[in-house]
């Protein structure tokens, strides 16, 4: 009988190993954490599996000029996080970058997405005012270290840390002067590092700075209408987000044009922006909610993808926003249209959308209201789409499937890299609890499972996946109250060891599973049950 049972288990494992037969679960309990059954072998050869970070969140402030997040978190420390945290020191990757590479090597990572700090390379914001040789040395060391370990660098030029001097001089992205300054900064980066960096990202999450930085005032530079937040030093939540978004697109396109004109033929690299994505589900079965869901997709994704693919904003945005939405000149439209070789897509959560036609007074109106939708974490029956992501939202692993398919079918089958996907845990947990982050394994493996599935079923052109994040770091607006890392950072002793969490050990095995790995891993906590495979998704409830 024992031999018969062993034979049955072996046959079950053998069948489940086949990528096209592995079942992806939409909700707990998850079984995808078994690296013997689901691993990098479910993806094509050469698929990049990496981790990600950004300069302000990991480098620390040593050796660079001030940026808008420095000023923002010091002027409004409570907005930097409930713990009043900021990026003054954080992980000190500026001096401890070799530790980062060692952790990535331990993870078996084949790629690393990081950003260059504009105010580190150009402390006074402009190339004409001087280049910092210390920054060149630092980034050369990091890039060379990655290449030596056969890790592919993906380098972001702007991850929200605008030099403060440019914000002071002309209000940063509110002014078209930013286009030339960003172009010059990008040109310098291509010149200095482009012989080794073959994957450039212009701007991280085009949606975020206009909305959180200029509509809500929750992010740097913290502008908004007075009645949205009395602490905002100035702003107009109805108009400024559209101006900033417009200038971001022009700056992005100018950088892409410089790369294609001066460097691409010799350096043989690629360049594109990063989009923050979400999947949206109807709040209920009404046509109004279904229509609101489509509007949410357009105002969230199409706001930027419309210009990038067609050289103009979506018609419904023009109808709803009116003259608050800027126009592209013919020359600008031609420059913006098609200004990407690939798209980086960040994906974390799914929301429900319901119709909201309420007209509010102009002094409390924000650009986020223009889609005439209300976004919620639960639907009309009180159901969430999946397990908790944080105190206010939930995740839905199949959402990544739908997002990838949506971008393929809506925006012309682009080359895609998943440039962020990750899960937070409380920042106040002790070492033992923080490193036993099994819920992060569930999050990562369930999303990777649906990513593999959509690539196979829909032939979506995805070539890489970067987990957020390499290690614990400063989290925008949350300080150190949350941890996203696959490795543990002790912020009371940042020079200490960077220990892999359970999620890091899982990712390590996922990337490079070996025959020596036990089938009955200690990570295998979820049972394989037909009941779980057959149960209805909460997203459909």
UniProtKB/Swiss-Prot annotation:
- Annotated membrane-spanning segments are none
Reactions it catalyzes = a thioglucoside + H2O = a sugar + a thiol; Hydrolysis of terminal, non-reducing beta-D-glucosyl residues with release of beta-D-glucose
Q: Where found?
A: Vacuole
User: From what superkingdom does this record's organism come?
Assistant: Eukaryota
Which residues are recorded as binding a beta-D-glucoside?
57, 159, 204-205, 348, 420, 468, 475-476, 484
Q: Name one GO cellular component term.
A: secretory vesicle
Signal peptide location in the record?
A: 1-19
- Residues at the catalytic site: 420 (nucleophile)
Glycosylated position list? 33, 108, 175, 236, 356, 379, 493, 512
Tissue expression, as annotated, is: Expressed in guard cells, phloem-associated cells and myrosin cells.
Please give the Gene3D superfamilies that the UniProt record associates with this protein.
Glycosidases
> Which UniProt key words apply to this protein?
Abscisic acid signaling pathway, Disulfide bond, Glycoprotein, Glycosidase, Hydrolase, Metal-binding, Plant defense, Signal, Vacuole, Zinc
Q: What is the effect of changing residue 459 to G?
A: In strain: cv. Su-0
Q: Name one GO biological process term.
A: abscisic acid-activated signaling pathway
**Keyword Translocase included in the entry's annotation:** no
Any GO molecular function: thioglucosidase activity
How this chain assembles, per its entry, is: Homodimer.
Q: What does this protein do?
A: Degradation of glucosinolates (glucose residue linked by a thioglucoside bound to an amino acid derivative) to glucose, sulfate and any of the products: thiocyanates, isothiocyanates, nitriles, epithionitriles or oxazolidine-2-thiones. These toxic degradation products can deter insect herbivores. Seems to function in abscisic acid (ABA) and methyl jasmonate (MeJA) signaling in guard cells. Functionally redundant with TGG2. Hydrolyzes sinigrin and, with lower efficiency, p-nitrophenyl beta-D-glucoside.
Check the record and name the PANTHER family matching this protein. Answer: GLYCOSYL HYDROLASE, MYROSINASE 1-RELATED
| Family affiliation | Belongs to the glycosyl hydrolase 1 family.
Q: What is this protein called?
A: Myrosinase 1
Q: Which organism is it from?
A: Arabidopsis thaliana
Gene that produces this protein? TGG1
């Amino acid at each position: 009988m024992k031999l018969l049972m062993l034979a049955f288990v072996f046959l079950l494992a053998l069948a489940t190993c086949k990528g096209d037969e592995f079942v992806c679960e939409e909700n707990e309990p998850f079984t995808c954490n078994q690296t013997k059954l689901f691993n990098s072998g479910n993806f094509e050869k050469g698929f990049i599996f990496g981790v990600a970070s950004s300069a302000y969140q990991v480098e620390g402030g040593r050796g660079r000029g001030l940026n808008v997040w420095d000023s923002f978190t010091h002027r409004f420390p409570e907005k930097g996080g409930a713990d009043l945290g900021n990026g003054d020191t954080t992980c000190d990757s500026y001096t401890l970058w070799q530790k980062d590479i060692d952790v990535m090597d331990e993870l078996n990572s084949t790629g690393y997405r990081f950003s260059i700090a504009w105010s580190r390379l150009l402390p006074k914001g402009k190339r004409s005012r001087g280049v910092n040789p210390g920054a060149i040395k630092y980034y050369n060391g990091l890039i060379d270290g990655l290449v030596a370990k056969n890790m592919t660098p993906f380098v972001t030029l702007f991850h929200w840390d605008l030099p403060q001097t440019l914000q002071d001089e002309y209000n940063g992205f509110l002014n078209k002067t930013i286009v030339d300054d960003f172009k010059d900064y990008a040109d310098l980066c291509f010149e200095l590092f482009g012989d080794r960096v073959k994957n450039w990202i212009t701007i991280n999450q085009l949606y975020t700075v206009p909305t959180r930085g200029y509509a809500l005032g929750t992010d740097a530079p913290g502008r908004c209408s007075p009645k949205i937040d009395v602490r905002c030093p100035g702003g107009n939540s109805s108009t400024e987000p559209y101006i900033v978004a417009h200038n971001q697109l022009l700056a992005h396109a100018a950088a892409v044009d410089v790369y294609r004109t001066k460097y691409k033929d010799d350096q043989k690299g690629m360049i594109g922006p990063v989009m923050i994505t979400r999947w949206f589900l109807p709040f209920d079965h009404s046509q109004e909610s279904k229509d609101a869901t489509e509007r949410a997709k357009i105002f969230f994704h199409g706001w930027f993808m419309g210009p990038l693919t067609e050289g103009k904003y979506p018609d419904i945005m023009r109808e709803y926003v009116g003259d608050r939405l800027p126009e592209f000149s013919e020359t600008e439209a031609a420059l913006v249209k098609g200004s990407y070789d690939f798209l980086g897509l960040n994906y974390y959560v799914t929301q429900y959308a319901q119709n909201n036609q309420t007209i509010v007074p102009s002094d409390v109106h924000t650009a986020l209201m223009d889609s005439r939708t209300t976004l919620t974490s639960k639907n009309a029956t009180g159901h969430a789409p999946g397990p908790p992501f944080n105190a206010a939202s939930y995740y839905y692993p199949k959402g990544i499937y739908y997002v990838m398919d949506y971008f393929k079918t809506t925006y012309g089958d682009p080359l895609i890299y998943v440039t962020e996907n990750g899960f937070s845990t409380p920042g106040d947990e002790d070492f033992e609890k923080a490193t036993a982050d099994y819920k992060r394994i569930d999050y990562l493996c369930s999303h990777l499972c649906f990513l593999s599935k959509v690539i196979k079923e829909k032939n979506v052109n995805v070539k890489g996946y970067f987990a957020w994040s390499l290690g614990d770091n400063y989290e925008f607006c949350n300080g150190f109250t949350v941890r996203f890392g696959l490795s543990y950072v002790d912020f009371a002793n940042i020079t200490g060891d960077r220990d892999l969490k359970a999620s890091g050990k899982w990712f390590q095995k996922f990337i490079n599973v070996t025959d020596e790995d036990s089938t009955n891993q200690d990570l295998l906590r979820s049972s394989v049950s037909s009941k779980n495979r057959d149960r209805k998704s909460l997203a459909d409830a």
